[in-house]
Amino acid sequence: MMKQIQVDLGERSYPIYIGQNLMNDSEALSRYLLKKRILIVTNETVAPLYLNQIQEVMVSFGEVESVILPDGEQFKDLAHLDAIFTALLQRNYGRDSVLVALGGGVIGDMTGFAAACYQRGIDFIQIPTTLLSQVDSSVGGKTAVNHPLGKNMIGAFYQPQLVLIDTQCLHTLPAREFAAGMAEVIKYGIMWDGKFFQWLENNVQALKRLETEALVYAISRCCEIKADVVSQDETEQGVRALLNLGHTFGHAIEAEMGYGNWLHGEAVAAGTVLAAQTARSLGLIDESIVCRIVQLLQAFDLPVSAPESMDFDSFIQHMRRDKKVLGGQIRLVLPTGIGQADVFSQVTESTLEQVICCA
């Protein structure tokens, strides 16, 4: 069972393939890799699990080499980006080469940014191995590295040639990482598709058991939504901003606690609850909607409150650096119901302080 979704961006359009054991499907990969020099970028966790397997498939297309980076958000920086450039330069890779991102969101973001920059742009494909990267970061062309003063502050919009999603990878994913990915899955239901949110409420156990049919449906629905949004607004000038539900608060948590201490999805989960509580305080939603959001996040063992060590001042200093800030105004994506959200720029700091201090 393989599902195909198209991201429509004119001449930069590309497919997303979703199914089980797709990493062994040479036909799906051949169009993008035949007679190419291939550099696989992966990390120390994923390499022992899947690097040999994917190399054996790709070696029939051309020369295949790899670079293995440390695993973790704390390594998503310029120093480790440079390791990719060094590998490309030392091995004389040209513009006809292809980078392959084999890993989670960190590997995908860094590989994509390296592809965007190297010789002013070379092809890359995404083979995401975590749920979070499968449903979110591998689709849409956002690539970046972190800076000590902010997450994803140095990057580019650069689309892959292909996204290949193999649900079998989720069977080797730690439970905490799977839960973190579910935060992004739930986000899609809150900000775009109320029926999908209800489906998630009714299929918690099937997803936690990693049932293939449930996984393929959930991942496909997320990718359909992401593809639709990106096709309308590739560079986040409008509707794409809705995909940042929970992220302004979440990025503040990640930055304050130190990248890697809270997983991105965990921070987004807590941030989504804060966004819902802010919406409730503004009269946009009622308490019953906040409760549904909290209960679904808790069903997947996700945090629903910020770290106790974080106060309003620590939140606001990071939120003021958020990429969505315009004219000095913090802009928040807030739910206006289950299945809908909007961007608000007139939320006062006193309102935020009340929400954060009472959370």
UniProtKB/Swiss-Prot annotation:
Name this polypeptide is given: 3-dehydroquinate synthase
Lineage, uppermost ranks: Bacteria, Pseudomonadati, Pseudomonadota, Gammaproteobacteria, Alteromonadales
GO BP: amino acid biosynthetic process; aromatic amino acid family biosynthetic process; chorismate biosynthetic process
Keywords, alphabetical: Amino-acid biosynthesis, Aromatic amino acid biosynthesis, Cobalt, Cytoplasm, Lyase, Metal-binding, NAD, Nucleotide-binding, Zinc
Keyword check for Transport: no
SUPFAM superfamilies tied to this protein: Dehydroquinate synthase-like
Pathway field: Metabolic intermediate biosynthesis; chorismate biosynthesis; chorismate from D-erythrose 4-phosphate and phosphoenolpyruvate: step 2/7
Reactions accelerated catalytically: 7-phospho-2-dehydro-3-deoxy-D-arabino-heptonate = 3-dehydroquinate + phosphate
This enzyme's EC code(s): 4.2.3.4
